Each structure stands twice: as C-alpha cells, then as structure tokens.
C-alpha cells in the first residue's frame, strides 16, 4: 500500500498511521526509510514480559507539557483535574536495527471506562453461570465467557462427574493491570 501511495501521489514525505494489525516489523522498517515515519498502536499485552513491566511501571509518567515525573500511584483519581488528565511516558525501544519510541499513556478516565465495561461483562457472566444449561466457550476478548472458569476435577485431583462454573478472578486481575493504559510505537523524534 505504501509503495502504491509513493508512486501514485509522488509523496516524498508521509507518516504512516495504523492499528497494530498492520504494524509488523517489516512495515515499520519500510516506513522508516527515506522521509517516511510511522505511528502505530502497540499491544501492551503482547509485549515481552520485561518490556511490558517497564511500560506499565507506574513511575516516570508526565503530564503533557511538563518535565516533572509523576508516580501514578500517588494520583488522587477522584480529583476532577487528575481524572481528566492524560499522563504519558516514553520508552526507547530497539527492534533489530530500528530505534523506536514506545509512548505509553495512562488516563484515569479511560481506566474507569474499561472497568465499567468489564463490570457489566462480569454481571453477564454471572447470569450465564446461574442459568441452567450447557455453557459455551468464550470466543473473543469482549466475550463475558472469558471470565468463566470451568472446574472438572475435585480438589483432590480426581475426575469429577459434574462441571462447576465460577467467575475467574485471576482472569479479571490479569485484565485490570492494563486498565487506563494505551500505547503507540513510533520512529518520530521530538516532543510528545
């Protein structure tokens, strides 16, 4: 696609923006040649564990326009100004021979939004558990069934005749750690 744009529009410069589905390393490499650049959404969940821990570490965030570092754990998210502010941090990343910057944002408002949605999905999952009948498997990241855990063995490890369904608290905790966070990766240089 980018090659076609270069040919058809005779562009000498452009910034490629996409979601992570079109953000492969090969696409990023191509879009770092010449006077091209890119900004691509980046999945925090799919990052290597050590990189994800750095990205989600609550220290070294800033408000846009400020050089002062903020520890997200110190925020009073009930304060309206804090609630409506987006915080960010930049993490240098080297992918092969490409120097990139991961920009991680945190928004208390986005966190609250994600929690409201998940709470409704958990309520739906509880209704499914309490409704007699066969249970289906969760199909995607928005399916309430992803919060349902099926147990088919007894605590002693014996095979059970009956399957027991419960809310999967571990799955809820895994998802909660990403609440409020969003990331993009770019090769653009300069101030955020």
Regions found by a protein language model. Give the residues of each.
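Anion-binding and metal-coordination hotspots
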Residues: 1-192
């Amino acid at each position: 696609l980018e090659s076609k744009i270069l040919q058809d529009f005779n562009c000498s410069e452009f910034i490629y923006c996409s979601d992570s589905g079109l953000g492969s390393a090969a696409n990023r490499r191509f879009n770092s040649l010449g006077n091209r650049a890119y900004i691509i959404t980046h999945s925090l969940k799919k990052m290597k564990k050590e990189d994800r821990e750095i990205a989600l570490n609550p220290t070294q965030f800033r408000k846009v326009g400020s050089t002062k570092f903020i520890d997200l754990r110190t925020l009073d998210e009930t304060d309206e100004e804090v609630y409506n502010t987006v915080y960010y941090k930049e993490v240098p990343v080297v992918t092969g021979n490409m120097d990139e910057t991961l920009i991680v944002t945190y928004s208390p408002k986005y966190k609250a939004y994600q929690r409201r949605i998940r709470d409704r999905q958990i309520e739906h999952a509880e209704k499914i558990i309490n409704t007699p009948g066969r249970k289906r498997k969760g199909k995607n990241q928005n399916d309430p069934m992803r919060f349902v855990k099926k147990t088919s063995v007894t605590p002693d490890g014996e095979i059970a005749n009956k399957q027991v369904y419960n809310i999967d608290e571990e799955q809820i905790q895994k998802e909660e750690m990403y609440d409020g966070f969003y990331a993009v990766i770019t090769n653009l240089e300069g101030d955020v």
